[in-house]
A protein has these predicted regions:
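Conserved beta strand-loop-helix elements of the APE1-like EEP
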Residues: 105, 110, 250-257
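Flexible, gly/ser-rich surface segments that form the specificity/activation loops bordering the active-site cleft
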Residues: 227, 234-242, 253-323, 339-347
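A short, polar/charged loop-to-alpha-helix boundary motif
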Residues: 344-357
C-alpha cells in the first residue's frame, strides 16, 4: 500500500514538473524573436571592410527640366526659372537643349537597421533641391511669370528680326564667291530657326495666359549607372520615392525594386552610431570626380579615401573625392553618415526605417 502511495506521489510530481517546464517555455517564446532581432542588429553594427564600402557606393545620372502645364498637361519645356520669369529657351519637347544632366553619387541602403531590406533603394541627393523654393514662389505668381515671359519672348523676337535683316542685307550685296558668304548664309538660317522657335513658344505662352489652371513643375529623373558582374555598364531606370522638397536628400529605387547581386547595402542605424561632431579619422566611399563635365561613366570605379572629421559635423576630404551623396565611415569601418556640402549628415537624420525620406 505504501509503495502505491509513493508511486502516485512520484507521478504527481513528474506531472507538476512538466507543467512548470511547459509554462516556462511558453513564457519564454515571446523573447525568442526579440533575441533574434537583437543578434541581427548587433551583427549589422559590425565594421565594414573597404571592399564592402566600395560595393555600397552607387553612380547615378540625374536629368531635370521644367514644364509649363495647362490642366496638368505639359505644353512647353524650358531649362531655367526665376520667381518672376521663365527662360526664353522654351521648346515644344523635352529635348537636350532644355535638359540639365549631372552625374551624382549615392549609396545602397537597407530600409530597416536590423535586417536586409534594400529592395533596390539608394540614398542620394537632388542637385535641384534649392530650386523648389523658387518654383513655389513662381507658381504663386504664375500670371505675372507668364506675362513677363511673353514680354521677354517678344523682345527676343524683335532682336532676332533685326539681326536677320542685317544679315539678309549683307547677303543681298554680296555673292556666293565672296569671302565669308557661306558662313553668313549659315548664320542667317540659324537665326531664322531661332526666330521661328521663339514665335512658336510665344504662341503657346499667350494661350497659357488665358488659362486659369496653368502651372510650372520641375521634373527630375534618375538612372542608375551600374557595372554588372562582367564589368559592363548598364543603365537602370529609377523611381523617386522621396517627395520633392527643398531638403537635399532623396531615396530612389530601381524600377524593378531589385538589388544587384554585386552590391553591399549599408544600414542606417539610429542608435549606437558614431558622433558626427567629434574629431576622428574617417573613410569616404565614392566615385571621385563624377561632377566633371566629361566624366567617363564606363571607366568609373568606386574608391575609398581617408580623411578626418574636423568637428561640428565637418570633414576635410575635398568635394572632388567626397561628392554629395557619398557614404562616410569611421576609420574602423562603422557607418557614420552622408557627405553633403563638406559636412557629414548623420544617419539619425533619416529616421527609423527611413521615415524622414519616405512618403
Amino acid at each position: 500500500m505504501q509503495s502505491v502511495r509513493w508511486e502516485a506521489t512520484r507521478l504527481m510530481k513528474k506531472s507538476t514538473n512538466r507543467k512548470r517546464t511547459s509554462r516556462i517555455i511558453l513564457q519564454s517564446l515571446p523573447a525568442v524573436p526579440v533575441a533574434i532581432v537583437v543578434v541581427i542588429y548587433v551583427m549589422s553594427l559590425m565594421p565594414c571592410s573597404t571592399k564592402k564600402m566600395e560595393r555600397g557606393a552607387a553612380l547615378i545620372e540625374h536629368k531635370s527640366y521644367y514644364e509649363l502645364t495647362v490642366s496638368g498637361k505639359p505644353v512647353a519645356w524650358f531649362d531655367a526659372l526665376t520667381d518672376s520669369c521663365m527662360s526664353d529657351n522654351i521648346m515644344l519637347s523635352a529635348d537636350s537643349s532644355v535638359t540639365k544632366r549631372s552625374i551624382i553619387n549615392g549609396c545602397w541602403v537597407n530600409k530597416y537597421a536590423f535586417m536586409p531590406s534594400c529592395h533596390g533603394m539608394i540614398l542620394t541627393t537632388d542637385p535641384d533641391s534649392m530650386a523648389y523654393k523658387t518654383l513655389a514662389t513662381a507658381n504663386k505668381n504664375i500670371g505675372n511669370v507668364i506675362k513677363n515671359t511673353a514680354e521677354r519672348l517678344e523682345s527676343a523676337i524683335k532682336s532676332l528680326s533685326k539681326k536677320d535683316e542685317e544679315l539678309r542685307y549683307y547677303l543681298s550685296v554680296h555673292n556666293v564667291n565672296d569671302d565669308g558668304y557661306n558662313t553668313m548664309a549659315y548664320l542667317d538660317g540659324r537665326l531664322k530657326q531661332q526666330k521661328e522657335q521663339a514665335e512658336k513658344a510665344l504662341e503657346i505662352i499667350r494661350k497659357a495666359q488665358t488659362a486659369k489652371n496653368a502651372a510650372i513643375r520641375l521634373v527630375s529623373k534618375y538612372t542608375l549607372l551600374h557595372k554588372d558582374t562582367a564589368g559592363h555598364t548598364v543603365r537602370i531606370a529609377c523611381n523617386t520615392i522621396t517627395p520633392a522638397s527643398e531638403k537635399p536628400f532623396r531615396i530612389i529605387q530601381t524600377s524593378d525594386k531589385q538589388t544587384p547581386d554585386n552590391v553591399s547595402p549599408t544600414y542606417l542605424h539610429q542608435w549606437f552610431t558614431p558622433a558626427t561632431d567629434a574629431e576622428r579619422g574617417i573613410i569616404v566611399a565614392s566615385y571621385p570626380g563624377c561632377m566633371l563635365s566629361r566624366y567617363d561613366v564606363n571607366g568609373a570605379k568606386a574608391t575609398t579615401f581617408s580623411g578626418k572629421a574636423t568637428g561640428k559635423s565637418r570633414h576635410d576630404i575635398p568635394p572632388m573625392l567626397a561628392p554629395d551623396g557619398a557614404a562616410i565611415y569611421t576609420s574602423d569601418g562603422r557607418m557614420m553618415g552622408i557627405s553633403y556640402n563638406g559636412r557629414i549628415t548623420g544617419t539619425g537624420n533619416f529616421g527609423l526605417a527611413l521615415k524622414n525620406l519616405l512618403p
